[in-house]
Amino acid sequence: MNTFGRELRITTFGESHGRAIGVVIDGVPAGLPLTEEDIRKELDRRMFCHIHWLNPRCEPEEFEILSGVKDGHTQGTPIAIVIWNKKAISSYYDELWMKPRPGHADLAYYLKYGKFYDHRGGGRASGRTTAAIVAAGAVAKKLLALVGAEVAGHIVELGGVEVKRPYTFEDVKKSWEKPLPVVDDDALAAMLEVLRKNAAEGDSVGGGVEIWAVGVPQGLGEPHFGKIRADLAHAAFSVPAVVALDWGAGRQLAKMRGSEANDPIVVKGGKPGLETNKIGGVLGGITIGEPLYFRVWLKPTPSVRKPQRTVDLAKMEPATLQFKGRYDVSVVPKALVALEAMTAITLADHLLRAGVIRRDRPLKDPVV
Amino acid sequence: MNTFGRELRITTFGESHGRAIGVVIDGVPAGLPLTEEDIRKELDRRMFCHIHWLNPRCEPEEFEILSGVKDGHTQGTPIAIVIWNKKAISSYYDELWMKPRPGHADLAYYLKYGKFYDHRGGGRASGRTTAAIVAAGAVAKKLLALVGAEVAGHIVELGGVEVKRPYTFEDVKKSWEKPLPVVDDDALAAMLEVLRKNAAEGDSVGGGVEIWAVGVPQGLGEPHFGKIRADLAHAAFSVPAVVALDWGAGRQLAKMRGSEANDPIVVKGGKPGLETNKIGGVLGGITIGEPLYFRVWLKPTPSVRKPQRTVDLAKMEPATLQFKGRYDVSVVPKALVALEAMTAITLADHLLRAGVIRRDRPLKDPVV
Amino acid sequence: MNTFGRELRITTFGESHGRAIGVVIDGVPAGLPLTEEDIRKELDRRMFCHIHWLNPRCEPEEFEILSGVKDGHTQGTPIAIVIWNKKAISSYYDELWMKPRPGHADLAYYLKYGKFYDHRGGGRASGRTTAAIVAAGAVAKKLLALVGAEVAGHIVELGGVEVKRPYTFEDVKKSWEKPLPVVDDDALAAMLEVLRKNAAEGDSVGGGVEIWAVGVPQGLGEPHFGKIRADLAHAAFSVPAVVALDWGAGRQLAKMRGSEANDPIVVKGGKPGLETNKIGGVLGGITIGEPLYFRVWLKPTPSVRKPQRTVDLAKMEPATLQFKGRYDVSVVPKALVALEAMTAITLADHLLRAGVIRRDRPLKDPVV
Amino acid sequence: MNTFGRELRITTFGESHGRAIGVVIDGVPAGLPLTEEDIRKELDRRMFCHIHWLNPRCEPEEFEILSGVKDGHTQGTPIAIVIWNKKAISSYYDELWMKPRPGHADLAYYLKYGKFYDHRGGGRASGRTTAAIVAAGAVAKKLLALVGAEVAGHIVELGGVEVKRPYTFEDVKKSWEKPLPVVDDDALAAMLEVLRKNAAEGDSVGGGVEIWAVGVPQGLGEPHFGKIRADLAHAAFSVPAVVALDWGAGRQLAKMRGSEANDPIVVKGGKPGLETNKIGGVLGGITIGEPLYFRVWLKPTPSVRKPQRTVDLAKMEPATLQFKGRYDVSVVPKALVALEAMTAITLADHLLRAGVIRRDRPLKDPVV
């Protein structure tokens, strides 16, 4: 449905051109410092307003925390966040009614929800709804910080341009100072060029991102159906446009022999660890204290300005569609921030499931 | 934990060298024809006993249905299936105690469960435990058959050998008449050669499989967190050794432009459908009546006979490990059957979630 | 946590004196007629504004539907409803800070949430939060109406005054035309007298209500942990101040012999049914097509104006507390509406779980 | 369905006259001492074999732990327990086929499962299936012991005979040395007399039990839908034949005024606590460190030897039924043990949900 997680549970709602979108975040213990600024920071990261030609009318989100926070701390009760929709120009979408856009959710919604769904701006299927996920991710990241864990991602492929040079987690985090989070400046320049070209031609591009989670404690996850890998795959494929995922070295591992693929176990600082980390920090579904990383691949934005073949559902006959509304040349940058958020939410959920963070008492209580 | 699904729910248990493994299947309506033969057929498919050199001591599973079935039909109550473990030679594993095998779950289990876990034969992390999933999959496949849906998979890559020629879903199903389910005879021959070579050298290989689900009705899945893609990704990554997944055309979609990636919508038999199906039958997380397909990539079996570097956890110093027990040269064939099962379970769960199959009354009741 | 239900799922949020309370209702199929008026009607029923001396400053709730509804129908997506909190006078509560009110949740919240919780107006534990449940109940009642089922309750005891004369379900529904829903006019007069007396003396009273669900189809519920009785008990005890529940004839059944307690099975209109219905319409946890009914007992409002003994948590020494804010002389009337709502939500959830209402397609779609 | 709990999860299966009944217990951390003897002790308590005339052919259960336990400790993996059904004489039940027993689940099962369910011995609805719950309760009690909490219950009413004298929790525990756990010897004698009389007359009686949970830490439970009271109500009503529940002083509270009902808050050993405990240890759904207690009322066994009116479902005409099989004169003693188990399971689940017991590492690991 629209709820994700077991002990940290987020419930999202809202359509793109409706009154608002939002999220209820449940399971956060009392006493976590949390301000509107924490939420705003992540919502702003998602917007990439600084690339003006990419988002010509970019504006910061307007949101409110309706519950669960008092005096800069969580109360232990559900945190409801509403992100108000701006006055949108929906007339672009009038032509699309009953003419499902190829590659978009329109056809599926028509079959499942009939004439009742709000198709304007993509409605419930709009990438815009990931803003609610990103707001929840801001809270999850603060929970992770309690145990010294952090999540960050970057773009590794865009419009066919791939990042090829080696990098560290520090490089990943620093890449956010650039126009797009790309560790390799040459690749970044080429990517921006591809984006400009596609914007000019009314087309779109896909790409790939890599998410890292560092400092995640050992012992999270379970052998069969609570595997960290499986829960994060679920999380990642919940983000619109995701079409593939490689865990750790991913598909390359499938081409290796066992003697190559296995990461030797070594003593590190008096504790057992991996010499290499091709497996991405998880063995048998359980974290071992090594960094987690995985790559996620996204298809191009389905909305393009080129004419496309579709069906007029009222007449049930072929039709041509030309989209005239706003669209993102690539969903990759925004999806990256949503994927960071989903990763943080999933891992914070596991911290609570495993009891690493307790909830029978406040996180800190100077009164007691 | 060890339960998967919402309305069709499977709960698995058991360690590789313990008394038994098994599964409880909950949510099946009364009146579904089900016999031991249905279960046995799937358990046999998983074993590939016919490739003698691959499974030198291959024997069919011994199992019992303990509840939920009477006179060849389901009762509507939980179906418990126990698969008895055979007298296993665990002495191979004595040396491994406190010497975690690289690439295996040992190290993670040691960190999470301490000295309490049963490491013999891989314990709870053993690929053997997927037999319980396969038994549950047999039931799920019968539920899918009620609406005319079927699931089948095949091997598309093994030890670096790839299937390259085109094929149909009929080819996929017919490939099960061959020693391994590979649609391309040349590729099959090369794969068998690679397997033999690695068996001789005490090494292992990974590969990839493709799962198809055909006849799945429209309207299953939900826009945000009950996406069919996300639930199937969760399902697939629950199978041991899975490291990557491509939905539909997968990573290739990420390299296309929107105008190429979108599948045109056309009229098919008086209804809207896709001209091509690069997206794998799901739009916005919801089925549209087109076939679903995805590829899953598996790493090589971590157990190999070559010496490997590990740590002696008792002394916390480097150690060398040489595994002498039985192992599968590749997990790919067995995992394929488990992936078919997980796919069938996930989709049957969605049939129940959406109410396509009702549960307030028996499937058929000549009495009424 | 703050989510209830499996296929119809409500998630509530909000503190009494915070910005707003609200609810997200998930799982409703597309095409259910739903207007603000439907919600308002139930919110108004909960307020009993017509008894002026009971609610001196009674005002209708201000609420908004933020998502999931378009043109008077549900979209199939989550329905978020926000009920704005009015400018509340919180100064009454300043004295209560660190002086937990006996009988209220204050002490428990202090222990679990420390200084971080919002104690004003009872915060998250306030009876006010049941308005969100009542809003969700309005939607659930409309789902029940699809299959001809309806839920209604009445007061059977208040301040020690009991309803003793026999009545029908029609009487129960008609009792809502009176100041309080009580089928017996003499009892009603006595109850109003008791309420007035306690209001004057600054004390409060408890009581009991009975909930009926008529027209519920057969075959809902499951034998072990999805029992209708157990799910409704869970639902009922989720409403604040509930301290006891009698299912059907309840505790009286415990005093009978088997030969008296069993309801004879008879042919009714060509189908098997019960001659009497002491068991309250459920056998073995499953509905049989007979009316469901149960009684729920509520303790008196803990907030009273009489001085009470408590502890000053800052000094950890005895203290006396005198509450000066507004309080309800009895929670029974409002809780009754909340219990109707929880009953409707639980039963509508079971209609979806069992597939009686489908969700792979809209409820009605003239387009198709 | 047949799964109960969130972080401690039990899944039961089995029909009374099928091959076996059983339970899978999931979520127990590694390192909990657990032997067959722990399970057997609780299964034996449920049987009351020492009252020979009550259970003429009483025999201890035969069971096996199939997984999750090694060398006297839990492994952290699911614990599957199978309780084998004995060779039962099912011929008693032949006459009952298509003639539903009044008061039993037969009619409901016929409507929901049609001719497919196993009616022999009550099938899935048999009280016998609570043995699986009791086995799981044995494990939950050991988890509670980790934090110093314990659960025990006693009979407070049977066949109309009530316990009236005051007692302590020690009295409750000591009452288990008697033939039936009744704190008052006079009441016990009268109850045994009533049981004998009803056994002789082929009738049955109901009654009431009280469950105590002492030593439960503060801060468990949540304000809205994870209320301890609501979860325990759900737990209690999951036991067959339960028809009413009083939490704490229960219905008596509903007759008091607020000034009487509220328990004064006092300083106890330097901490805040309750002077009296009419509310049963829970405020606002959350534990406060005081003992929990509640009473549960059970209807008489529906199976009696007296002739009863029913319907022949094949002919759809009135019929008379005379049951000739074995039956329990009262379900109260066995249900008491099941209710203790459900209470322990629910509270242990909350210990895990709140993170009081962690699961990222073993409970104790001398190796580390």
From Swiss-Prot, chains A, B, C, D:
The keyword Lyase applies. This is Chorismate synthase. Its EC number is 4.2.3.5. It holds the Pfam family Chorismate_synt. Its cofactor is FMNH2. The lineage of its organism: Archaea, Thermoproteota, Thermoprotei, Thermoproteales, Thermoproteaceae. Keywords: Amino-acid biosynthesis, Aromatic amino acid biosynthesis, FAD, Flavoprotein, FMN, Lyase, NADP. FMN binds at residues 124-126, 284, 299-303, 326. The gene is aroC. The keyword NADP applies. CDD domains: Chorismate_synthase. This reaction introduces a second double bond into the aromatic ring system.
